[in-house]
A protein has these predicted regions:
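Bacterial N-terminal signal peptides
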Residues: 9-20
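An N-terminally biased module of ancient metal coordination in phosphate/nucleic-acid-related enzymes
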Residues: 30-122
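Hydrophobic faces of well-ordered beta-strands that scaffold small-molecule active sites
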Residues: 69-73, 97-100, 124-129, 159-161, ...
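Acidic-and-aromatic substrate-binding clefts and catalytic sites of carbohydrate-active enzymes
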Residues: 75-83, 100-110, 133-142, 169, ...
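H/E-rich (His + Asp/Glu) clusters that bind or coordinate divalent metals
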Residues: 80, 87, 233-381
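Active-site gating loops and adjacent loop-to-helix segments of metal-dependent hydrolytic enzymes
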Residues: 37-40, 44-47, 65, 123, ...
Length: 381
C-alpha cells in the first residue's frame, strides 16, 4: 500500500514538473505576443479617429436656405473651363455670387476680371491686391493708391490684403512693415474715396504664436504643418498685431474693413464684440473658422444675433462639398457632429441656428451693403 502511494506521489510530481516546463514558457510567449499586439494596435493621435456613438437628429443640407455671397474665396488665374465648372457647382448649393480675393493688380487683374466677370458678370466679384515690388522707393503708398484706382476702373470691387502684411513684409533695412504703417495711409484713404471695402488678413490663430507644447490645442495641426508656428524670434507677438490692426481701423473711419477669419478672435467672442463696439467700420467674415463657432453654439448664436449687421459669409479654400457644414451649423440645432477638416478641430461641433433675418444678413445683405456693383435683384428682400 505504501509502495503504491509513493509511486502515485512520484508520478504527480513528474506531471507537475513536466507541466511547468511546457506551460511556463508558453505562458511567457503569450504575454510577449499580447504586448506586441497591444503595441501594434495602439493608434497615434493622427490615426485615432473615433466614430461617435451618439444618436441624434441629423439634417442633411446640401444647399443654403437662401442664395448667398461668398465674400472670401481664392482662384488664381482661372481658365474659361474652370470658371464654367465653378458656376455649375455654385448653382448646386445656391452660391449666387463668389468674391475672388486673388485678383492681383495691373494686367493680371484685367485677365482675372475678363476670365470671371467677362463670362459671368453677375456671378463674380474680383478684389485687387497690392504689389510690393517698389516698396523701398519713396512715394510707394501714393503709387499703390494710383494703381488701385486704375484697378477699380478695370473691374476690381475691393482690396484684399494678405497675411504677409504686418507679419513678414519688411523694408530693405530689415524693419518690419507694421499693419498701421503711415506709408499706406494713401491706399486706405483711396479705398474710402472709391467706396470699396478692404478685406484684410492680420495675424494667425493665437495658438500659433503660443509655445508649441502639449498644452497647445493646435498642437496636432502644427505637427502636420510646422511652418504655421509663429515663434517670437521670427514674428511679432499676436497682441502687437491686434493693436496695430485696431489702430489702423480707427485711423481710417471712412474706410470699411472686413477682418478675415473673425479677426482671429473666434475663440473669444466677448473680446471680438468689444472690438466691434469700438470700431464701427469693422466687419468680420467667418471663413475657415466655423469650428470656433461650432464648439460654442450658445455664444455663437447670441453673438450673431447681436452683431448681425457686421458678419459676412465666407469659406476661404474652395471645395463645393464642404459648404454644407456651414449650412448645417447656421441653419440647424444639430448636435455633436464632425467638422470637415480634422486638423482645424479635434472636437465635434454643434449647430447654432439663427433666425432667418440674421441668416439673410450673414448670407448676402451685409455683403450687398459693403461691396459695390452686386446686383441686389438676385436676392430676396
Amino acid at each position: 500500500m505504501n509502495s503504491t502511494r509513493a509511486i502515485t506521489v512520484f508520478f504527480l510530481i513528474l506531471v507537475g514538473l513536466f507541466g511547468t516546463l511546457i506551460v511556463g514558457p508558453r505562458k511567457a510567449m503569450t504575454q510577449q505576443d499580447q504586448a506586441a499586439q497591444k503595441k501594434q494596435q495602439t493608434p497615434t493621435i493622427d490615426e485615432y479617429q473615433p466614430k461617435s456613438m451618439l444618436v441624434t437628429k441629423e439634417h442633411k443640407i446640401e444647399r443654403a436656405k437662401f442664395p448667398f455671397i461668398d465674400i472670401h474665396s481664392h482662384h488664381w488665374n482661372p481658365t474659361a473651363e474652370e470658371v464654367d465648372q465653378l458656376v455649375k457647382e455654385m448653382d448646386t448649393i445656391s452660391l449666387r455670387v463668389m468674391v475672388n480675393l486673388s485678383g492681383g493688380t495691373g494686367e493680371r487683374l484685367k485677365n482675372t476680371v475678363a476670365a470671371m466677370k467677362g463670362r459671368y458678370p453677375d456671378r463674380f466679384v474680383v478684389f485687387a491686391n497690392m504689389s510690393y515690388d517698389d516698396l523701398n522707393t519713396p512715394g510707394f503708398g501714393k503709387r499703390v493708391a494710383a494703381r488701385l484706382e486704375e484697378d477699380v476702373k478695370n473691374g476690381a470691387q475691393g482690396l484684399k490684403i494678405f497675411k504677409d502684411f504686418g507679419m513678414e513684409l519688411k523694408y530693405a533695412n530689415g524693419q518690419r512693415v507694421h499693419v498701421d504703417d503711415p506709408e499706406f495711409d494713401a491706399v486706405f484713404e483711396k479705398c474710402a474715396e472709391l467706396k470699396i471695402p478692404v478685406l484684410i488678413h492680420v495675424a494667425e490663430p493665437s495658438a500659433f504664436f503660443d509655445p508649441w507644447d502639449y498644452h497647445n490645442e493646435r498642437w496636432q495641426e502644427l505637427k502636420e504643418f510646422p511652418s504655421r508656428a509663429r515663434p517670437p524670434a521670427k514674428y511679432p507677438p499676436f497682441e502687437t498685431l491686434m493693436t496695430e490692426r485696431n489702430h489702423l481701423f480707427a485711423r481710417h473711419p471712412r474706410t470699411n474693413f472686413i477682418a478675415a477669419h473673425l479677426g482671429f478672435h473666434g475663440n473669444d467672442l466677448e473680446r471680438l464684440g468689444k472690438t466691434l463696439d469700438s470700431l464701427p467700420n469693422m466687419y468680420v467674415d467667418i471663413a475657415a473658422v466655423l469650428a470656433e463657432l461650432g464648439r460654442q453654439p450658445y455664444s455663437a448664436h447670441d453673438f450673431l444675433v447681436k452683431y448681425q449687421d457686421r458678419v459676412l459669409m465666407g469659406k476661404d479654400i474652395y471645395e463645393v462639398n464642404e459648404y454644407k457644414w456651414y449650412f448645417r451649423a447656421l441653419e440647424t440645432r444639430d448636435e455633436y457632429f464632425e467638422y470637415y477638416r480634422h486638423r482645424h478641430a479635434f472636437w465635434r461641433i454643434y449647430g447654432f441656428q439663427v433666425p432667418d433675418e440674421v441668416l439673410k444678413k450673414v448670407y448676402y445683405k451685409n455683403a450687398l451693403k459693403l461691396v459695390p456693383g452686386i446686383d441686389a435683384k438676385a436676392f430676396p428682400e
